[in-house]
């Protein structure tokens, strides 16, 4: 089974190399697709250099200008499907998601779950590098989504998700709109 991790970046030169090392040190083999939105800090150049070490498993898509997280994920989903991946995961580069948990996300998806959402709030709060205001906004937004949708999601704004190929092929990605971590579909006729 081929597994891809999509990591959108913008000014992540302080984190990208450590993230690459961490993902490629996991006991499960993952390929990594970095989608950089024209980072002025040189993030893409670091990835280009690191591709010399991982030419078959580290991929880079460079986009001009800051086009946004949602469109980066959609671009990554299309790229992953076009390149034959069976599972496609998404995560942030700033280590607010623990890369070690990629293995657990994949294993849960491989058990027959089409979408597996990682949570920072299952056992207390597991978030680093966030100001309290952002943490509270995320926590209460997730609580709101859980109440309104009656879905047992602990972290609706996680952005740490593993999708099966089947789940993504079921969506019309051209009709999907994403704003940050929120995914919208359209049935416009």
What are these regions (language model features)?
Residues 17-18, 41-50:
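Acidic helix N-cap motif at the loop->helix transition within catalytic regions
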Residues 36-45, 95:
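A conserved acidic beta->alpha catalytic loop
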Residues 2-4, 31:
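Cell-envelope/extracellular polymer assembly enzymes that use nucleotide-activated donors
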Residues 12-15, 39, 98:
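Donor nucleotide-sugar binding loop of glycosyltransferases
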Residues 12-25:
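Short, well-formed alpha-helical segments that are part of the catalytic scaffolds
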């Amino acid at each position: 089974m081929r597994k891809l991790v999509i990591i959108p970046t913008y000014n992540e030169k302080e984190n990208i190399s450590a993230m690459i090392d961490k993902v490629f040190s996991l006991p499960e083999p993952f390929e990594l697709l970095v989608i950089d939105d024209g980072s002025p800090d040189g993030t893409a150049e670091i990835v280009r250099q690191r591709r010399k070490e991982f030419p078959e498993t580290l991929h880079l898509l460079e986009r001009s200008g800051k086009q946004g997280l949602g469109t980066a994920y959609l671009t990554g989903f299309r790229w992953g499907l076009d390149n034959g991946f069976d599972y496609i995961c998404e995560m942030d580069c700033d280590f607010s998601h623990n890369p070690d948990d990629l293995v657990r996300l994949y294993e849960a998806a491989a058990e027959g779950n089409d979408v597996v959402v990682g949570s920072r709030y299952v056992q207390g709060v597991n978030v680093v590098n966030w100001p309290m205001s952002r943490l509270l906004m995320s926590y209460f937004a997730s609580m709101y989504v859980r109440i309104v949708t009656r879905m047992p999601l602990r972290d609706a704004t996680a952005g740490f998700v593993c999708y099966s190929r089947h789940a993504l092929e079921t969506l019309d990605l051209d009709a999907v709109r994403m704003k940050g971590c929120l995914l919208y579909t359209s049935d416009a006729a």
